[in-house]
Amino acid sequence: MSLDLALDIQHATTCDWLPTDEQFALWATTAIGNSMDEAELTIRIVDTRESQMLNSTYRGKDKPTNVLSFPFEAPPEIELPLLGDLVICAAVVENEAREQQKTLEAHWAHMVVHGCLHLLGYDHIEDEEAEEMESLETQLIEGLGFTDPYKEQ
């Protein structure tokens, strides 16, 4: 079974390097895997101002962040393939990649996989949940040809 993904990519900022639409689709499809037959996903690339505003509004943290996940929750009697939205701050991803000595491509892939797993219900608040999520992220990222995103550089 393969995933039928409808992907909407919104560019609300500019930056030095962005993944291609094909890369975004590959990373999202890999993360979603066989969880759904079809899915609709929006990835919005934003600046630090928009990221900070959303992070403050929805998480109470007054600073920009790398990725925010907004899952779509339909009423129980309605079945829709809407997975949700990812909001990724390009400047934060670039800074983190540089600080963590990762390639931009590898860190963008990690942010898309990480965000998609949140949309699927994974979380990292509790230690046990964090271990499960990080293990799955590592498996998916390594399957894409990148190194373990949690391994110390």
Swiss-Prot record:
Name the Enzyme Commission number(s) assigned to this protein: 3.1.-.-
Q: Which cofactor does it need?
A: Zn(2+)
* Record's cofactor remark: Binds 1 zinc ion.
Classification via SUPFAM superfamilies = Metalloproteases ('zincins'), catalytic domain
Q: Does the keyword tRNA processing apply?
A: no
User: Which Gene3D superfamilies does the entry mention?
Assistant: Metalloproteases ('zincins'), catalytic domain
Q: List the InterPro entries hit by this protein, alphabetically.
A: MetalPrtase_cat_dom_sf_prd (IPR023091), YbeY (IPR002036), YbeY_CS (IPR020549)
Its cellular-component GO annotations read: cytoplasm
Q: Which GO terms describe its molecular function?
A: metalloendopeptidase activity; RNA endonuclease activity; zinc ion binding
Its keywords, alphabetically, are:
Cytoplasm, Endonuclease, Hydrolase, Metal-binding, Nuclease, Ribosome biogenesis, rRNA processing, Zinc
Biological-process GO terms, alphabetical:
rRNA processing
Q: List residues binding Zn(2+).
A: 114, 118, 124
Its localization reads: Cytoplasm
Q: Which family does it belong to?
A: Belongs to the endoribonuclease YbeY family.
Function noted in UniProt:
Single strand-specific metallo-endoribonuclease involved in late-stage 70S ribosome quality control and in maturation of the 3' terminus of the 16S rRNA.
By what name is this protein known? Answer: Endoribonuclease YbeY
Lineage of the organism = Bacteria, Pseudomonadati, Pseudomonadota, Gammaproteobacteria, Alteromonadales
